[in-house]
Amino acid sequence: PLISGMKLRERSVGNIVAELEECVNKYDIRNFFFRADTFTMNKKSVIELCREIINRRLNIAWVANSRVNTIDEERLTWMKKAGCWLVAFGIESGNDEIQKIIKKGTTRAQAREAVKLCKKLGVKTYGFYLIGFPWETKEMIMDTLQLAKELRCNFSEIHIAVPYEGTEFHKIARDFGILTETAVGHNYFSNPAI
């Protein structure tokens, strides 16, 4: 299935804070992970959310996903004040050509800047990388490994690229005839593994 789609869907700040308050006050939950890939996309909403977390004295610790090109000092400063202790980045590749092919819309330079900013402000980092694209050369893979080594995120994961249905990678893999019908079906997330 298409994992996230192309349309940005946001919850309102009020809706998010109400849920956080319920978790804190009713269940004493104080650790959260904002899983949205686009959490930092809307600067105004991020800052408003952080202000609300602070103003309501929720005293929570949290982690968020972010793109490397949607983080800046003001946003990250507010996030840290509101309890964010780690930002996870989908860096994907250390090769700008691969980034263009997969239409990531980010560069190595932006990854370096984002991780550097987090280190400056004392926010831990988690880097996610992908290797194994059919058009990827050994040198391109080494670029990714070198970038991961250079960035020295607090945590890193390197995954083998999977052509999920509905993605550009799936279309390319099918066009090249390298994808079997059963490799990653349309109901990949619906079927139990065992």
Regions found by a protein language model. Name each.
Residues A36, F128, N191-A193:
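Short, solvent-exposed beta-strand edge segments and adjacent coil->beta transition regions
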Residues M41, W78, G105, A109, ...:
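A broad, structure-centric signal for solvent-exposed, well-ordered loop/edge residues
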Residues P1-Y126, Q146:
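Radical SAM [4Fe-4S] cluster-binding motif and immediate context
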Residues K124, E139-I194:
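C-terminal accessory regions of radical SAM enzymes
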Residues R9, P134-T137:
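Alpha-helix C-terminal capping/termination sites
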Residues G5, G132-F133, I194:
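Short, well-ordered beta-strand elements within core beta-sheets of diverse protein domains
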Residues R35-N42, R67-V68, L130-W135, H159-E168:
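Short, solvent-exposed turn/loop segments enriched in Gly/Ser/Thr/Pro and often Arg
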